[in-house]
């Protein structure tokens, strides 16, 4: 019978072989907080950046963001574009749904004059454009909205009742095989937005699945499940959504973390709300009763007033954010993220 030392040697050899064959980060201990040296782009949500473990979405990788309708998928990707533009990166938006609203994008902080936009006629055209942009090496972030709208040419040209079983899945599988190595070489972040469908006849387990077959689930380095879990009200008026994002797959840091944040209508992700919560948790901001204070100075009664103070004092807000980012990215396990169980085989599931 093998001794513990021999078992450890065998395990180290196996892990070394796996990393050699599949790349660093293909396997790690679940509690391992060591982050890979990968360039990342902020998502616009401080809490989500921490949950991802490397400070944002990884460059040179494929990312899938999926969820129900009106859950904040496009808002999150536009927020990524806004953050990427702040660092001088070139962005492209492949709008297969033909639903991009430039006015809404500008409200989220996107400089609408700069991003490249394409509204392709079919799925093949969309993925060819994506491939050409990646191969150019000049585009840093590409958003494909959405996989469900990547309709194969044969389906568009066919009659309404024709059967095209598995056509979209084959298209995605072929495209991702071509794209993966090019994306890595170009150090380009490609984000696919995806929708949810219900599997028919599922008696046990989760009936939800994403469109476009299984290829994207395998090729994506990060998969984010985004859900609306509540409403934000000001009096009787609904002014935004409480949003929850679960990292169901992560090949660059430990997965299965989740985070809550607010999306305000016409403004996007509320950074001030996250800064207040994290600031209180890590004692940068003090709270006594309903009052919030920063450096012994009262900044507001109630969270709404404290958030307003941060908006009116951007220098202090920036200092609080940079202090928290430096501290928490070094120890992401102490952040406002909760590790949750992987509920289904592919990580898709309802939140508990």
Swiss-Prot record:
Superkingdom of origin organism: Bacteria
CDD domains xrefs: RecA (cd00983)
GO BP terms in the entry: DNA recombination; DNA repair; SOS response
Protein name: Protein RecA
NCBIfam families (UniProt xref): tigrfam_recA
Chain's role: Can catalyze the hydrolysis of ATP in the presence of single-stranded DNA, the ATP-dependent uptake of single-stranded DNA by duplex DNA, and the ATP-dependent hybridization of homologous single-stranded DNAs. It interacts with LexA causing its activation and leading to its autocatalytic cleavage.
Phylogenetic placement of the source organism: Bacteria, Pseudomonadati, Pseudomonadota, Gammaproteobacteria, Pasteurellales
Entry-linked HAMAP family: RecA
Binding site residues for ATP: 67-74
SMART domains: AAA
Matches recorded under Gene3D superfamilies: P-loop containing nucleotide triphosphate hydrolases
Annotated localization: Cytoplasm
Keywords from the UniProt entry: ATP-binding, Cytoplasm, DNA damage, DNA recombination, DNA repair, DNA-binding, Nucleotide-binding, SOS response
InterPro entries in alphabetical order: AAA+_ATPase, DNA_recomb/repair_RecA, DNA_recomb/repair_RecA_CS, P-loop_NTPase, RecA-like_C, RecA-like_N, RecA_ATP-bd, RecA_C_sf
């Amino acid at each position: 019978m093998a001794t513990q030392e021999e078992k450890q040697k065998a395990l180290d050899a196996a892990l070394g072989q796996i990393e050699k064959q599949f790349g660093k980060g293909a396997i790690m201990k679940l509690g391992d907080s060591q982050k890979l040296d990968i360039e990342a782009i902020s998502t616009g949500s401080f809490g989500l950046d921490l949950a991802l473990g490397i400070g944002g979405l990884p460059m040179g990788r494929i990312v899938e963001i999926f969820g129900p309708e009106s859950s904040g998928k496009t808002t999150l990707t536009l927020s990524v574009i806004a953050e990427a533009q702040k660092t001088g990166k070139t962005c492209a938006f492949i709008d297969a749904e033909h639903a991009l609203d430039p006015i809404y994008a500008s409200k989220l902080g996107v400089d609408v004059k700069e991003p490249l936009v394409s509204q392709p006629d079919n799925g093949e055209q969309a993925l060819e454009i994506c491939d050409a942009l990646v191969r150019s090496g000049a585009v840093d972030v590409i958003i494909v909205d959405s996989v469900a709208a990547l309709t194969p040419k044969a389906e568009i040209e066919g009659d309404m009742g024709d059967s095209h079983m598995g056509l979209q899945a084959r298209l995605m599988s072929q495209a991702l095989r071509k794209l993966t190595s090019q994306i890595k070489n170009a150090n380009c972040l490609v984000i696919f937005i995806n929708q949810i469908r219900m599997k028919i006849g599922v008696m046990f387990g989760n009936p939800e699945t994403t469109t476009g077959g299984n290829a994207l689930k395998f090729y994506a380095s990060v998969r984010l499940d985004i859900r609306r879990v509540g409403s934000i009200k000001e009096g009787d008026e609904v002014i935004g959504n409480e949003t929850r994002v679960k990292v169901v797959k992560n090949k660059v840091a430990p997965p299965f973390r989740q985070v809550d944040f607010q999306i305000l209508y016409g403004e996007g992700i509320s950074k001030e709300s996250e800064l207040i919560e994290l600031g209180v948790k890590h004692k940068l901001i003090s709270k006594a009763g309903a009052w919030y204070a920063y450096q012994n100075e009262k900044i507001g009664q109630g969270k709404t007033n404290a958030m307003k103070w941060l908006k009116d004092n951007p220098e202090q807000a920036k200092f609080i954010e940079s202090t928290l980012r430096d501290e928490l990215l070094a120890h992401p396990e102490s952040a406002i993220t909760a590790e949750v169980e992987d509920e289904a085989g592919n990580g898709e599931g309802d939140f508990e």
